[in-house]
Amino acid sequence: MQRILMAPGQSCCALAILLAIVNFQHGGCIHVTSSASQKGGRLDLTCTLWHKKDEAEGLILFWCKDNPWNCSPETNLEQLRVKRDPETDGITEKSSQLVFTIEQATPSDSGTYQCCARSQKPEIYIHGHFLSVLVTGNHTEIRQRQRSHPDFSHINGTLSSGFLQVKAWGMLVTSLVALQALYTL
């Protein structure tokens, strides 16, 4: 058996790298999908939250309209508090759905709708794609689009590509500092 001996300073550097990697993994597999369906004048906006059993605790799923900068449970159209299902294991992905229904769509229902999820423990904020709804007379047009503004990724705690980029850069910088410390010892 081969043993690797490290100087006291080197073990701290190795610990810093390990902590950065563990922190980068945080966030699990929680994600949001949204869709829309129409029957006559009725419009159903469906938000689906995919999560594992232990990730459900404290999650709130909600719909917002024309409010991309302040979409929160306090400013929502409708919300659902996700409950932990004791019947499921911690491995299987489970879905929770929130359907926002507009019984008879009118031009005042036109706008940009977004489904989001938020948790307090740990602080997680996930926002889904936008659904653009345009109601003119008897015609309703629905389009799904990606987030178009890059600043969405700067919202504190947001699990988005911007959030993961910040985490990756943090891990890279921490690793480089640790390697430099190892090199100077």
Swiss-Prot record:
Keyword tags: Adaptive immunity, Cell membrane, Disulfide bond, Glycoprotein, GPI-anchor, Immunity, Immunoglobulin domain, Innate immunity, Lipoprotein, Membrane, Receptor, Secreted, Signal
Tissue and organ expression note: Expressed in resting and activated NK cell subsets (at protein level). Expressed in resting NKT cells (at protein level). Expressed in activated CD8+ T cells (at protein level). Highly expressed in intraepithelial lymphocyte (IEL) subsets, particularly in innate-like CD8A-positive IELs (at protein level).
Domain Ig-like V-type, chain residue ranges per copy: 28-136
Pfam families: V-set
Domain of life, per lineage: Eukaryota
Glycan-linked positions: 138, 156
Lipid attachment, kind GPI-anchor amidated serine: 160
GO CC, one annotated term: extracellular region
Residue numbers covered by the propeptide annotation in the UniProt entry: 161-185
Signal peptide coordinates: 1-27
Result of knocking out the encoding gene: No visible phenotype.
GO molecular function: activating MHC class I receptor activity; kinase binding; MHC class I protein complex binding; MHC class Ib receptor activity; signaling receptor binding
Record-annotated disulphide pairs: 47-115, 64-71
GO biological process: adaptive immune response; defense response to Gram-negative bacterium; innate immune response; mucosal immune response; negative regulation of adaptive immune memory response; negative regulation of angiogenesis; negative regulation of CD4-positive, alpha-beta T cell costimulation; negative regulation of T cell receptor signaling pathway
Description of how the protein assembles with itself and partners: Homomultimer; disulfide-linked. Interacts with classical and non-classical MHC class I molecules. Interacts with TNFRSF14 (via cysteine-rich domain 1); this interaction is direct. Interacts with LCK and CD247/CD3 zeta chain.
Protein name: CD160 antigen
Organism: Mus musculus (Mouse)
